[in-house]
Amino acid sequence: MQIWVDADACPNVIKEVLFRAADRTGMMVTLVANQPLKTPPSKFIRTVQVASGFDVADNEIVQRVEKNDLVITADIPLAAEVIEKGGIALNPRGERYTPDTIRERLNMRDFMDTMRASGIQTGGPNTLNQRDRQQFANELDKWLQQARNQAK
Protein backbone atom coordinates (compact mmCIF):
# COMPACT_ATOMS: atom_id res chain seq x y z
CA MET A 1 0.00 0.00 0.00
CA GLN A 2 1.07 3.53 -0.66
CA ILE A 3 -0.17 7.09 -0.93
CA TRP A 4 -0.69 8.86 -4.25
CA VAL A 5 -1.10 12.64 -4.41
CA ASP A 6 -2.80 14.59 -7.19
CA ALA A 7 -0.12 17.18 -6.54
CA ASP A 8 -0.86 19.98 -9.02
CA ALA A 9 -3.75 21.27 -6.90
CA CYS A 10 -2.82 19.87 -3.49
CA PRO A 11 -2.18 22.64 -0.93
CA ASN A 12 1.42 22.86 0.32
CA VAL A 13 0.32 22.54 3.94
CA ILE A 14 -1.26 19.15 3.12
CA LYS A 15 1.88 18.02 1.28
CA GLU A 16 3.89 18.91 4.39
CA VAL A 17 1.61 16.73 6.53
CA LEU A 18 2.14 13.89 4.04
CA PHE A 19 5.93 14.37 4.00
CA ARG A 20 6.09 14.14 7.80
CA ALA A 21 3.84 11.05 7.78
CA ALA A 22 6.01 9.35 5.15
CA ASP A 23 9.17 9.80 7.20
CA ARG A 24 7.44 8.92 10.47
CA THR A 25 5.83 5.71 9.18
CA GLY A 26 7.95 4.61 6.23
CA MET A 27 4.90 4.75 3.96
CA MET A 28 5.74 5.60 0.34
CA VAL A 29 4.20 8.88 -0.87
CA THR A 30 4.19 9.56 -4.62
CA LEU A 31 3.28 13.00 -5.91
CA VAL A 32 2.03 13.11 -9.50
CA ALA A 33 2.07 16.47 -11.30
CA ASN A 34 2.61 18.04 -14.70
CA GLN A 35 5.29 20.36 -13.35
CA PRO A 36 8.49 19.87 -11.33
CA LEU A 37 7.90 19.64 -7.58
CA LYS A 38 10.16 20.41 -4.64
CA THR A 39 10.17 17.72 -1.99
CA PRO A 40 12.34 17.15 1.05
CA PRO A 41 15.03 14.49 0.69
CA SER A 42 13.50 11.18 1.75
CA LYS A 43 13.57 7.60 0.53
CA PHE A 44 9.81 7.52 1.19
CA ILE A 45 8.86 10.46 -1.06
CA ARG A 46 9.02 10.44 -4.83
CA THR A 47 7.60 12.48 -7.67
CA VAL A 48 6.27 11.52 -11.08
CA GLN A 49 6.16 14.31 -13.63
CA VAL A 50 3.72 13.77 -16.48
CA ALA A 51 3.12 15.75 -19.66
CA SER A 52 0.88 18.79 -19.52
CA GLY A 53 -2.68 18.23 -20.59
CA PHE A 54 -6.19 17.66 -19.40
CA ASP A 55 -6.38 14.79 -16.85
CA VAL A 56 -2.88 13.47 -17.68
CA ALA A 57 -1.87 13.34 -13.99
CA ASP A 58 -5.25 11.88 -13.05
CA ASN A 59 -4.91 9.14 -15.67
CA GLU A 60 -1.42 8.30 -14.42
CA ILE A 61 -2.73 7.87 -10.88
CA VAL A 62 -5.64 5.70 -12.05
CA GLN A 63 -3.25 3.46 -14.00
CA ARG A 64 -0.95 2.97 -11.01
CA VAL A 65 -3.31 2.87 -8.03
CA GLU A 66 -3.90 -0.53 -6.42
CA LYS A 67 -6.49 -1.86 -4.03
CA ASN A 68 -6.37 -0.07 -0.64
CA ASP A 69 -3.89 2.58 -1.83
CA LEU A 70 -4.76 6.06 -0.60
CA VAL A 71 -5.19 8.87 -3.14
CA ILE A 72 -5.24 12.51 -2.03
CA THR A 73 -7.34 14.55 -4.44
CA ALA A 74 -10.05 17.18 -4.60
CA ASP A 75 -10.90 16.00 -8.13
CA ILE A 76 -14.29 14.26 -7.89
CA PRO A 77 -14.05 12.22 -11.14
CA LEU A 78 -10.56 11.01 -10.14
CA ALA A 79 -11.84 10.04 -6.69
CA ALA A 80 -14.68 8.08 -8.34
CA GLU A 81 -12.22 6.14 -10.52
CA VAL A 82 -9.98 5.41 -7.53
CA ILE A 83 -12.91 4.02 -5.55
CA GLU A 84 -13.97 1.94 -8.55
CA LYS A 85 -10.50 0.34 -8.57
CA GLY A 86 -10.68 -0.45 -4.85
CA GLY A 87 -8.56 2.46 -3.66
CA ILE A 88 -9.34 4.97 -0.93
CA ALA A 89 -9.90 8.63 -1.86
CA LEU A 90 -9.41 11.47 0.61
CA ASN A 91 -9.66 15.16 -0.19
CA PRO A 92 -7.33 17.80 1.30
CA ARG A 93 -10.08 18.87 3.71
CA GLY A 94 -10.18 15.41 5.28
CA GLU A 95 -13.36 14.14 3.61
CA ARG A 96 -13.02 10.45 2.85
CA TYR A 97 -15.13 9.57 -0.16
CA THR A 98 -17.27 6.43 -0.16
CA PRO A 99 -19.17 4.81 -3.04
CA ASP A 100 -22.33 6.54 -1.75
CA THR A 101 -20.87 9.99 -1.18
CA ILE A 102 -18.94 10.01 -4.45
CA ARG A 103 -22.14 9.54 -6.46
CA GLU A 104 -23.70 12.47 -4.62
CA ARG A 105 -20.59 14.61 -5.21
CA LEU A 106 -20.51 13.71 -8.93
CA ASN A 107 -24.15 14.74 -9.28
CA MET A 108 -23.50 18.04 -7.49
CA ARG A 109 -20.43 18.68 -9.64
CA ASP A 110 -22.44 18.10 -12.82
CA PHE A 111 -25.20 20.39 -11.55
CA MET A 112 -22.71 23.16 -10.75
CA ASP A 113 -21.09 22.75 -14.19
CA THR A 114 -24.51 23.20 -15.78
CA MET A 115 -25.15 26.33 -13.71
CA ARG A 116 -21.77 27.82 -14.63
CA ALA A 117 -22.37 27.03 -18.31
CA SER A 118 -25.62 29.00 -18.12
CA GLY A 119 -23.75 32.04 -16.77
CA ILE A 120 -24.55 31.74 -13.06
CA GLN A 121 -21.62 32.62 -10.77
CA THR A 122 -21.22 29.76 -8.29
CA GLY A 123 -18.05 30.75 -6.43
CA GLY A 124 -15.37 28.37 -5.27
CA PRO A 125 -14.54 26.47 -2.12
CA ASN A 126 -13.63 28.25 1.10
CA THR A 127 -9.97 28.67 2.01
CA LEU A 128 -8.42 25.65 3.72
CA ASN A 129 -8.48 26.35 7.46
CA GLN A 130 -6.96 24.82 10.60
CA ARG A 131 -10.01 22.62 11.19
CA ASP A 132 -9.69 21.23 7.64
CA ARG A 133 -6.00 20.49 8.17
CA GLN A 134 -6.75 18.72 11.45
CA GLN A 135 -9.53 16.68 9.85
CA PHE A 136 -7.13 15.69 7.06
CA ALA A 137 -4.43 14.66 9.54
CA ASN A 138 -6.96 12.61 11.54
CA GLU A 139 -8.22 10.76 8.45
CA LEU A 140 -4.67 10.17 7.24
CA ASP A 141 -3.75 8.71 10.65
CA LYS A 142 -6.78 6.38 10.50
CA TRP A 143 -5.70 5.10 7.08
CA LEU A 144 -2.09 4.68 8.21
CA GLN A 145 -3.26 2.67 11.23
CA GLN A 146 -5.41 0.44 8.99
CA ALA A 147 -2.43 -0.04 6.66
CA ARG A 148 -0.21 -1.06 9.59
CA ASN A 149 -2.84 -3.50 10.84
CA GLN A 150 -3.20 -5.09 7.40
CA ALA A 151 0.57 -5.44 7.07
CA LYS A 152 0.75 -7.54 10.25
Swiss-Prot record:
Family classification: Belongs to the UPF0178 family.
Protein name, UniProt field: UPF0178 protein YPO3033/y1450/YP_2656
InterPro entries for this protein: UPF0178
Domain of life: Bacteria
Signal peptide positions on this chain: none
Matching PANTHER family: UPF0178 PROTEIN YAII
Species of provenance: Yersinia pestis
